[in-house]
């Protein structure tokens, strides 16, 4: 199933061929709106690919050399030479999400599934905008921004429980 969801000048192209369960698409569009507003982006388009655990494991192995399923992988758009800026600047990239991984994580972490979806989607969008978490400083910047954006959606800090478990 392919579907385009549009709000003003923001688009999410949903690719969900196996029809995996996903939350309300409006929730995800609201996440894109928040991230776009925060970064003063007036036009944006994202491909959201919903895949099985096996598919994301293959992608994770191919692009990250990690032979296991993960919740999300983001691919920032690299503008091909010759593509006009007005077209290239709108497309942020591709996000691949495995719903089964998200469901397991939400259960393990006692989180509402829709809250976890929104968190992980925002996380992926931030990767498309160049944020990363390769070191503690980058992680702190990215996590703080996620916490701030999620608070605007009425979602509690997703890192509190993890911080308590990790002794941070």
Curated annotation (Swiss-Prot):
Subcellular location: Cytoplasm
Top-level taxon of the source organism: Bacteria
Molecular function GO labels: metalloendopeptidase activity; RNA endonuclease activity; zinc ion binding
Entry's Gene Ontology cellular component terms: cytoplasm
The protein's Enzyme Commission number: 3.1.-.-
The keyword Cell inner membrane belongs to this UniProt entry's keyword annotation: no
Cofactors: Zn(2+)
Enzyme class: hydrolase
GO annotation terms (biological process): rRNA processing
Keyword NADP attributed: no
Record SUPFAM superfamilies: Metalloproteases ('zincins'), catalytic domain (SSF55486)
Positions with a binding annotation for Zn(2+): 123, 127, 133
Keywords per UniProt: Cytoplasm, Endonuclease, Hydrolase, Metal-binding, Nuclease, Ribosome biogenesis, rRNA processing, Zinc
Cofactor: how and how many bound: Binds 1 zinc ion.
Main subcellular localisation: cytoplasm
Protein purpose: Single strand-specific metallo-endoribonuclease involved in late-stage 70S ribosome quality control and in maturation of the 3' terminus of the 16S rRNA.
Family: Belongs to the endoribonuclease YbeY family.
Name of protein: Endoribonuclease YbeY
């Amino acid at each position: 199933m392919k579907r385009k969801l549009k709000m003003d000048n923001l688009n999410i192209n949903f690719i969900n061929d196996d029809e995996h369960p996903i939350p309300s698409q409006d929730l995800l569009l609201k996440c894109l709106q928040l991230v776009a507003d925060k970064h003063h982006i007036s036009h944006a388009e994202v491909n959201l690919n919903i895949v099985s655990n096996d598919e994301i494991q293959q992608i994770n192995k191919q692009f990250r050399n990690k032979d296991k399923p993960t919740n999300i992988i983001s691919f920032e758009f690299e503008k091909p030479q010759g593509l006009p800026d007005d077209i290239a600047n709108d497309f942020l990239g591709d996000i691949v999400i495995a719903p089964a991984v998200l469901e397991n994580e939400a259960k393990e972490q006692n989180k509402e599934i829709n809250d976890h979806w929104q968190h992980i989607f925002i996380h992926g969008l931030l990767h498309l905008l160049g944020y990363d978490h390769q070191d503690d400083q980058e992680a702190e910047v990215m996590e703080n921004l996620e916490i701030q954006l999620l608070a605007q959606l009425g979602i509690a800090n997703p890192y509190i429980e993890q911080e308590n478990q990790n002794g941070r």
